[in-house]
């Protein structure tokens, strides 16, 4: 199994009552087929807006690490330890957990 066609998706309930959708998977590009991409991104959406999209150091085959990243982000956002911003999340995306 890989992240190609199988992104990791989590939902965080933010302290202010909003929900954040967390996705760790292959970057979505309408011009390039999923199988031709290997860039794994961390994407956080709050409401209908994109709060952060960050390239990670992960490969498509690192499903367990992607799941761990999504869980860490979910838990951090839910607790208020992390803000749903690129600045707050990029340190997690830059490491293999």
What role is predicted for each listed range?
Residues 22-24, 40-44, 70-73:
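Hydrophobic beta-strand residues in large extracellular and virion-surface proteins
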Residues 50-64:
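A short, exposed loop/beta-hairpin motif centered on an aromatic-Gly-Thr core
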Residues 1-28:
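Negatively charged, low-complexity tracts enriched in Asp/Glu with abundant Ser/Thr
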Residues 23, 35-40, 61-66:
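Mixed-charge, low-complexity intrinsically disordered regions enriched for alternating acidic
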Residues 31-54:
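Short aromatic-glycine-(Arg/Gly/Cys) micro-motifs in beta-strand/loop hairpins
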Residues 61-78:
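A short, charged, amphipathic alpha-helix used as a generic interaction element across diverse proteins
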């Amino acid at each position: 199994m890989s992240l190609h066609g199988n992104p990791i998706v989590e939902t965080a309930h933010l302290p202010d009552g909003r929900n954040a959708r967390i996705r760790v998977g292959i970057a979505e590009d309408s011009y390039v087929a999923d199988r031709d991409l290997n860039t794994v991104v961390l994407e956080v959406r709050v409401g209908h807006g994109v709060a952060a999209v960050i390239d990670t150091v992960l490969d498509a085959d690192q499903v367990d690490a992607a799941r761990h990243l999504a869980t860490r982000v979910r838990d951090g956002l839910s607790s208020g330890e992390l803000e749903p911003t690129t600045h707050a999340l990029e340190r997690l995306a830059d490491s293999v957990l």
